[in-house]
């Protein structure tokens, strides 16, 4: 049985992720590039994201909608990654994607299982963007700044005639843009809020392996945690902002605790200095000097506490 030759209309697109390596802040890191491919024009703007979760998917879409100046009428997804989870033959959408889709008003659907011909266009675009823009491995310091430039670079790749229509792809892309739905008056805040209890050290743990410090003073308290694509925002139980951390990804455990958050406790427990993170974070000369000062201050019962308050 042959494949069905699909016909795409202006303003319709396909979405998919691919894997790329970048030198992120000096370290070679495996990331994901999200491509929103417009088969009518053969143009596919992209965004670089650290993962394929709902926050990354929706943030990439929001960034591209704002760059496009509108919202695609229909988006076809290769699979449920970042949108929901497969449950037997059905896909259960995440609450974040449901709210995001309702806010922007686009239609969505998924490729049929084992129907590779349905996603050929976007898979080809994912590969083309990777080969042309991520080889050799690019250096990235700020994902936000890199993503501001990335869609324009993808558009430059399409500055040629369409392989089947013989017309300018950028001209056809103008037709895609004219068919877009208008942007809503306000952008969608891409964040998943959840409540977590801080551990005895004042940390909250995401995905069972990424620890984020709220501070020792919040130990055992219920916290409100906001998960964004690039950040984790922590609020207290009343909704007051406590701290924001860069979001960690990967299978290895991470800990984003700030050693300076222990200074307050060291005032009350100076004997813990030897095993504190504050001590580990200091350069050798300063560490040795403070070791000597703490030893001298221990002659007085309150001396160490006075010393750490002066450091803080």
What are the residue ranges of the model-derived segments?
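Two-metal-ion acidic nuclease core segments, chiefly of the RNase H-like superfamily
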Residues: 90-108
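Mobile-element integrase/transposase regions
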Residues: 1-44, 52-59, 190-206
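RNase H-like two-metal-ion nuclease catalytic core shared by retroviral integrases
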Residues: 77, 88, 108-130, 146, ...
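Active-site-proximal acidic segments at structured loop/helix or strand boundaries
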Residues: 126-226
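Active-site beta-loop-alpha junctions of metal-dependent nucleic acid enzymes
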Residues: 47-70, 74, 248-254
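Protein C-terminal end segments and domain termini
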Residues: 234-312
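Acidic/histidine-rich, metal-coordinating catalytic segments
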Residues: 70-89
């Amino acid at each position: 049985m042959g494949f069905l030759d699909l016909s795409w209309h202006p303003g319709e697109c396909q979405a998919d992720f691919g894997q790329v390596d970048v030198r992120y802040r000096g370290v070679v890191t495996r990331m994901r590039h999200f491509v929103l491919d417009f088969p009518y024009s053969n143009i596919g703007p992209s965004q670089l994201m650290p993962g394929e979760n709902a926050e990354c998917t929706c943030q990439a879409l929001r960034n591209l909608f704002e760059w496009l100046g509108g919202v695609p009428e229909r988006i076809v997804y290769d699979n449920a990654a970042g949108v929901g989870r497969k449950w037997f033959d059905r896909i259960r959408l995440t609450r974040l994607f449901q709210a995001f889709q309702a806010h922007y008003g686009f239609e969505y659907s998924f490729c049929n299982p084992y129907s590779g011909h349905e996603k050929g266009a976007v898979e080809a675009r994912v590969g083309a963007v990777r080969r042309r823009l991520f080889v050799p491995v690019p250096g990235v310091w700020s994902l936000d700044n890199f993503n501001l430039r990335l869609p324009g670079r993808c558009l430059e790749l399409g500055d040629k005639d369409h392989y089947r229509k013989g017309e300018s792809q950028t001209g056809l892309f103008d037709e895609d843009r004219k068919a877009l739905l208008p942007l809503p008056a306000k952008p969608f805040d891409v964040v998943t809020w959840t409540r977590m209890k801080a551990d005895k050290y004042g940390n909250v743990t995401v995905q069972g392996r990424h620890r984020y410090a709220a501070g020792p003073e919040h130990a055992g308290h219920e916290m409100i945690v906001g998960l964004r694509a690039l950040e984790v925002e922590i609020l207290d139980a009343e909704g007051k902002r406590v701290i924001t951390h860069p979001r960690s990804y990967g299978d290895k455990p991470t800990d984003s605790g700030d050693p300076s958050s222990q200074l307050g406790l060291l005032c009350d427990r100076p004997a813990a200095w030897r095993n504190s993170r504050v001590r580990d974070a200091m350069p050798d000369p300063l560490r040795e000097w403070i070791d000597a000062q703490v030893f001298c201050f221990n002659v007085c019962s309150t001396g160490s506490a006075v010393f750490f308050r002066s450091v803080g």
